[in-house]
Design a protein with these regions (language model features):
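A membrane-topology feature that recognizes alpha-helical transmembrane segments
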Residues: 1-167
Length: 167
C-alpha cells in the first residue's frame, strides 16, 4: 500500500506545481488566434491546479499499485496536457494541433515502447485499436452533426482511446 502511496503523493505535488505553471501560462491567452482576441477573458482557472495534481497523482498511484510502469509513456502525456486542453477548449472551442500532435506522437511511441519493454504487443495493439475505435466513433458523430463535433475532438478521442485501450 505504501509503495503506491508515495509515488502518488509525489506525483500529486508535481502535478500541482505543473498546474500552477499551466494556469499562469494560459492566463497570457497566447493560444488565442487573431479572430479570438475579442472574446471575453475566461477569468481565473484554479481548477487547472487541482485537475493537474489529481490526474498525475492518481495515474502514478495506479502505475505503482499495479506495477504497470510500462504504461507510463502512454498515460502521462494525456495527464500532463489534459487540463490545458480542457481550459483552451472551454475558452475558444478549439483544441490546438501544437498540443495535440506531440501528445499523439508520444502516445504512439509509448504504445510501441510498451510492446518492446514488457507490456506486451497485445497491450500496444489494443491501444491502437482503442484509438481507432474512439476516433471512428467521433468521426461518425462529426458527420452526423455536420461538424458539431470538431476535428480536434476526434483527434483527442483517438488519443484517449489509445490510452484507455492500452489499460
Amino acid at each position: 500500500m505504501l509503495t503506491a502511496l508515495l509515488p502518488g503523493l509525489a506525483a500529486t505535488a508535481i502535478g500541482a506545481v505543473l498546474g500552477i505553471w499551466t494556469s499562469r501560462t494560459l492566463a497570457t491567452l497566447n493560444y488565442r488566434l487573431d479572430d479570438e482576441q475579442d472574446l471575453p477573458k475566461p477569468g481565473r482557472r484554479w481548477w487547472i491546479i487541482w485537475t493537474s495534481a489529481l490526474s498525475l497523482g492518481s495515474i502514478a498511484a495506479w502505475l505503482a499499485a499495479t506495477s504497470s510502469w510500462a504504461l507510463a509513456p502512454v498515460l502521462l502525456p494525456l495527464a500532463l496536457t489534459g487540463p490545458a486542453l480542457a481550459a483552451i477548449d472551454l475558452d475558444v472551442m478549439r483544441l490546438p494541433n501544437r498540443i495535440l500532435a506531440p501528445v499523439a506522437a508520444v502516445t504512439i511511441l509509448g504504445l510501441a515502447s510498451t510492446g518492446v519493454t514488457g507490456g506486451g504487443w497485445a497491450t500496444a495493439v489494443s491501444g491502437l485499436i482503442g484509438g481507432l475505435v474512439a476516433g471512428a466513433a467521433l468521426m461518425m458523430l462529426n458527420l452526423l452533426t455536420r461538424g458539431g463535433v470538431g476535428i480536434g475532438d476526434i483527434k483527442l478521442a483517438a488519443i484517449i482511446g489509445s490510452a484507455a485501450g492500452a489499460v
